[in-house]
């Protein structure tokens, strides 16, 4: 997922080393997340991780029209391992954000990206990603995430 520069130049950049370290730690943090990462690494679809542009937050890029039709595809994760805050400015261990985006990549890889919203407008795909990140939050000691863009996630949907 992160080796294109090494293949071209013959060495890893600091960014690549940091991302690889975060991926390895995620594999150790949670067995299910580790299996998800291995599935993405072995996928016939191409998934890559690139540095988030300055001033932007972590994100996953993919073809939304294909996703709405449940067509499996690759993705591009935008991730900055040096950003230690979430979108609201609260402290967050960086790999928590990576786990969230990896869940989106896994969903599009399998063709199961949900565009269904729950009653208060939160997309189910975000609840899935938040449940994934909460597994890592438990390991890092970061507070459990219970909201999405200021809206409370119903407790029954949180793992």
Name what the model sees in each region.
Residues 2-159:
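Catalytic toxin/effector domains delivered as secreted proteins or via bacterial secretion systems
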């Amino acid at each position: 997922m992160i080796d294109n520069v090494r293949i071209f130049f013959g060495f890893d950049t600091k960014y690549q080393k940091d991302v690889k370290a975060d991926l390895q730690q995620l594999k150790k943090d949670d067995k299910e997340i580790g299996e998800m990462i291995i599935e993405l690494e072995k996928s016939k679809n191409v998934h890559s991780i690139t540095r988030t542009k300055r001033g932007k937050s972590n994100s996953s890029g993919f073809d939304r029209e294909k996703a709405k039709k449940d067509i499996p595809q690759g993705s591009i994760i935008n991730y900055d391992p040096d950003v230690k805050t979430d979108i609201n400015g609260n402290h967050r261990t960086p790999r928590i954000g990576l786990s969230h985006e990896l869940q989106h990549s896994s969903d599009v890889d399998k063709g199961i990206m949900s565009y269904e919203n729950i009653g208060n407008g939160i997309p189910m795909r975000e609840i899935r990603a938040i449940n994934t990140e909460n597994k890592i939050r438990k390991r890092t000691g970061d507070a459990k995430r219970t909201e999405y863009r200021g809206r409370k996630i119903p407790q029954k949907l949180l793992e």
